Amino acid sequence: MYELPASVRLALWATHAIAADRPLSEALGAALPDVDAVEGGLPRLELWRDLGERIVCVDLPRPGVHGGLLPPGGPATQAAIEVGECLFVPSLGGVLVPRLEYYGPAGDEGLKLTLEPHDSDPVPIHRLEALALADIDRRFREALLAHVGVLESLHIAPFLGPSARERVDERLDGARWALPPGLHPRALRIITTAGLVVAALDEALTTSGGLDAGSVAARERTLRSLLDEAELALAQAATAAAIGLAHDAARPR
């Protein structure tokens, strides 16, 4: 079963809880139905809220490919790159990096998520508020078309073999998005579409499809490039959605 990255779910549920004046402990439970134990994170989230933060944002950086939302360099960004995700607050500059591990005896293992706190430079809020859903959507759609076109020009099907498609179907069967109510419809569509693409690409990258070495290398480069675009769209759309939740809550009723 596929789940969105923990940071995406946590950022949106934490922002929703702050906007609705709900306990942040509820946000952790709602965001992480697949996790048996959560360590850390709650005191830092509550501190951020008490110091006036209203928006929790997301970045999904990879080695060599920085998502562009966190300041480049620094221990916090490096820790996020190690695991491929983080949540952060812009004004104070705080970062939480989720690390998953299994615990318990064999046959009765549980899944624990540790939220590792880091300090970081603040992120100008105007940079984040400039994330327009229409632009994110357009860029992602263009990337999908361009990358599929490259694969077709190489006479390579984007996703090869029935076994890979079956594995994708298994991962997506009953996919748990674990997202809060009130998200902008366009943001929700981008988040779920990008999540589906990430799941499909993860599976596609596990098989060569019986291609020759040159085609395998070209295919992998193209798929990894598209994966970068999908994760960028996912992080940006989630951050834009969080900003939307906070702004909606601030409007006079």
Feature map (PLM): residue ranges:
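Intrinsic-disorder-associated interaction segments
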Residues: M1-A11, A17, D21, L28-A31, ...
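Internal, hydrophobic cores of structured domains that mediate oligomerization or house catalytic pockets
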Residues: G52-V150
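Arginine residue identity/basic-tract feature
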Residues: R9, R22, R44, R49, ...
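Alpha-helical oligomerization segments
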Residues: L151-R253
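Glutamate identity and glutamate-enriched acidic tracts
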Residues: E3, E26, E39, E46, ...
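N-terminal intrinsically disordered, low-complexity regulatory tails that precede a folded domain
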Residues: M1-S91
